[in-house]
A protein has these predicted regions:
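Bacterial N-terminal signal peptides that target proteins for export
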Residues: 1-7
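N-terminal signal peptide c-region/cleavage motif recognized by signal peptidases
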Residues: 13-15
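Second-shell loop/turn segments in exported
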Residues: 33-38, 111-118
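Solvent-exposed, conformationally flexible loop/turn segments
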Residues: 40-42
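A cross-family detector of function-defining hotspots
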Residues: 44-97, 116-162, 168-175
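Boundary at the C-terminal end of the N-terminal hydrophobic targeting segment
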Residues: 18-21
Length: 175
């Protein structure tokens, strides 16, 4: 009888943990920036840029190899966040060469948060409570916890147990 109770308790605890560690869904790749919803992959336009407020910098990052092609990336720097626009997949999606989409969103300030409420300054424990254990990795001296759905990824930079920044981006399918 005790063995069955232990097994039942183990299964119930697994179910509770699994429920808390829900996989990423499409809404996880949308954030609200200056009261404007911005989604990975949405068209980048002058109207969208203006709705986000005044950028302090708009710069050409370069032509970046991604998948089977090279694509143009631009960085748009705002107070608490950056948005990278790119002409990703214009050639395979029958779009104009100079049509851009939101290719990466970087959250740097506590007023910008993910769809699940994680912002720079949140605890690492809070991230794993809402997203699960994720994939931990080190890059250039920084610790990251990452989560992926298809070719989209959310990564949390962790410094001293707190979220320092959050990247929401596409994953190069060659990696």
């Amino acid at each position: 009888m005790t063995g069955r109770l232990s097994l039942a308790a183990l299964l119930l605890s697994f179910t509770a943990v699994a429920g808390a560690q829900q996989g990423l869904e499409e809404p996880d790749f949308t954030v609200t920036l200056n009261q404007q919803p911005v989604s990975l992959g949405q068209p980048w336009s002058d109207k969208l840029q203006a709705s986000l407020g005044k950028s302090s910098e708009d710069s050409f990052v370069g032509e970046v190899p991604f998948g089977d092609g090279n694509y143009k990336f631009y960085r748009h720097v705002f107070n608490d966040f950056d948005v990278y626009s790119a002409n990703l997949w214009w050639d395979s999606q029958s779009r104009d060469f100079d049509s851009y989409i939101v290719a990466q969103i970087t959250l740097r300030g506590a007023t910008s948060h993910t769809a699940r409420g994680i912002a720079p300054g949140s605890s690492e424990d809070n991230v794993t409570e809402l997203y699960g254990p994720g994939e931990k990795e080190s890059s250039d001296g920084a610790e990251w916890i990452g989560y992926q759905r298809d070719n989209k990824r959310i990564s949390f930079e962790i410094v001293k147990g707190k979220v320092n920044s959050i990247n929401i981006n596409y994953v190069d399918d060659r990696q």
